[in-house]
């Protein structure tokens, strides 16, 4: 059904949601902290979309972020790192809030750190936006990411939903993999 990013954008458009696809820099860039480059990119993108909401004919108070796997980590990062830009202001766009109004994470990766704890770069607070997580139990590498993040959201009083499926593994996008997965239906419900 949906695996490529442009297909996900098309699915969102069919729901009446304007989708913006961000191609971000990979985390490891010489001279930058591990997660700094992609966080800069998503902060700038959300600020840009919000600053240009009128021209894009969208509601600036309904800008969300969605990510799959490592993109889920990036979406969670911007959901918790929005008070201060991670780069010097370029123009007026960087004075506009880069806080997403909601967050959808599909089989997010890297949300847990060592010793079964939430990754240190994720400082969940009551200001973290409402979040929906979609995860398969048989995703052995990253199921803890969703579980730890979900509990952190709940502890902070953030509205959070988690759809946990028994099968699906990792990397299925929104396609029907032959398993009992209704990811797009769950996401439709959450959006």
Residue locations for each model-derived region?
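Short amphipathic alpha-helix adjacent to the substrate-entry channel of hydrolases
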Residues: 4-20
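Short beta-strand/loop motif that positions the catalytic acidic residue
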Residues: 133-135
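Short, proline-enriched alpha-helix->beta-strand connector loops that line the catalytic pocket
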Residues: 97-101, 126-131
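Primarily recognizes the serine-hydrolase "nucleophile elbow" in alpha/beta-hydrolase
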Residues: 44-120
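Conserved alpha/beta-hydrolase "acid-adjacent" motif
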Residues: 140-145
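Conserved small/polar residues in nucleotide/adenosyl-binding loops
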Residues: 1-5, 182-187
């Amino acid at each position: 059904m949906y695996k490529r990013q442009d297909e996900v954008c098309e699915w969102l458009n069919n729901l009446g949601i304007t989708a913006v696809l961000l191609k971000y820099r990979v985390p490891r860039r010489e001279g930058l902290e591990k997660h700094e480059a992609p966080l800069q990119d998503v902060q700038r993108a959300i600020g840009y979309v919000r600053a240009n909401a009128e021209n894009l004919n969208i509601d600036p108070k309904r800008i969300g972020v969605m990510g799959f796997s490592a993109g889920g980590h990036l979406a969670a990062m911007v959901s918790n790192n929005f008070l201060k830009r991670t780069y010097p202001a370029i123009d007026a766009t960087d004075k506009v809030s880069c806080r997403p109004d909601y967050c959808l994470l599909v089989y997010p990766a890297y949300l847990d750190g060592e010793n079964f704890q939430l990754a240190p770069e994720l400082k969940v607070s009551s200001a973290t936006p409402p979040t929906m997580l979609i995860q398969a139990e048989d995703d052995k590498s990253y199921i803890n990411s969703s579980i730890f993040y979900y509990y952190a959201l709940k502890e902070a009083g953030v509205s959070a939903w988690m759809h946990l499926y028994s099968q699906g593994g990792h990397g299925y996008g929104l396609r029907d993999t032959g398993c009992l997965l209704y990811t797009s239906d769950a996401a439709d419900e959450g959006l």
